[in-house]
């Protein structure tokens, strides 16, 4: 029998160019590619820059109208961008701008999370309230936020009738979305929310960690203007 086909080589690691640009270390220069070791080059300690570099994937969901924007294990990105700043919030905001998403600095944030994540989303909701965002939530999340002293307005779920959260998105009443959930109904509602967010270019987070990062980015934009430097300036 003929020999089995040779599998294709793995794709090149995408973290290398980002690490090289952010760290400016000799570790990725030609000496290493020619076989020199890190010890031979005098690099025996970890390089820790005095700034933050954040890589963001560029996802072309706007080209595929029926594809859910919820991420899975398969690769969906078509490129990458990087934001650099002296603090996390500024770097994150720059990375989002590079990926084509402008974070809002005022307006209303919609929050709807599953029960197990309600305590974790509380600090995020509190921070948005402190920077003068209004908060809109579905019934369960709304009740939890109210019990913990965070003002909010309840809105109908997609599956419960109209006017609902998707109508609010279409009418320009929501500028930011935090939505997690489980179960068939939550998944169906979440799909319609995510597609509406994509259509109207509204930032959204499907995880608590993503919501925290975006909140820090928004806070940074409100506190001060983003400064711009060349990569060479950061590496001096």
Residue ranges with predicted function:
Residues 1-24, 28:
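Single conserved hydrophobic/aromatic residue that forms the stacking wall/gate
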Residues 22-154, 158-183, 187-203, 211-214, ...:
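ATP-dependent carboxylate/acyl-activation modules
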Residues 207:
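Extended, alpha-helix-rich binding/interface surfaces that flank or overlap catalytic cores
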Residues 218:
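Histidine/acidic-residue-rich catalytic or RNA/ligand-binding cores of hydrolases
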């Amino acid at each position: 029998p003929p020999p089995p086909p040779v599998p294709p080589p793995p794709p090149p690691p995408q973290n290398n160019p980002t690490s090289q640009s952010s760290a400016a270390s000799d570790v990725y220069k030609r000496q290493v590619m020619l076989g020199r070791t890190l010890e031979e080059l005098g690099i025996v300690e970890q390089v820790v820059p005095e700034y933050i570099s954040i890589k963001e994937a560029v996802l072309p969901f706007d080209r595929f109208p029926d594809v859910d924007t919820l991420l899975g294990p398969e690769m969906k990105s078509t490129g990458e961008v990087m934001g650099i700043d002296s603090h996390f919030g500024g770097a994150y905001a720059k990375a989002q701008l590079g990926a084509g998403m402008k974070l809002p600095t005022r307006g209303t944030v919609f929050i709807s999370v599953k029960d197990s994540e309600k305590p974790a989303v509380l600090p995020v909701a509190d921070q948005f309230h402190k920077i003068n965002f209004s908060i809109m939530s579905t019934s369960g999340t709304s009740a939890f936020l109210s019990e913990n002293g965070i003002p909010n307005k309840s809105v109908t779920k997609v599956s419960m009738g109209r006017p609902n959260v998707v109508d609010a998105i279409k009418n320009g009443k929501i500028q930011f979305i935090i939505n997690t959930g489980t179960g068939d109904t939550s998944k169906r509602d979440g799909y319609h929310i995510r597609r509406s967010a994509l259509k109207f270019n509204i930032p959204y987070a499907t995880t608590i960690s993503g919501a925290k990062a975006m909140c820090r980015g928004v806070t940074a934009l409100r506190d001060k203007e983003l400064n711009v430097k060349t990569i060479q300036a950061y590496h001096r």
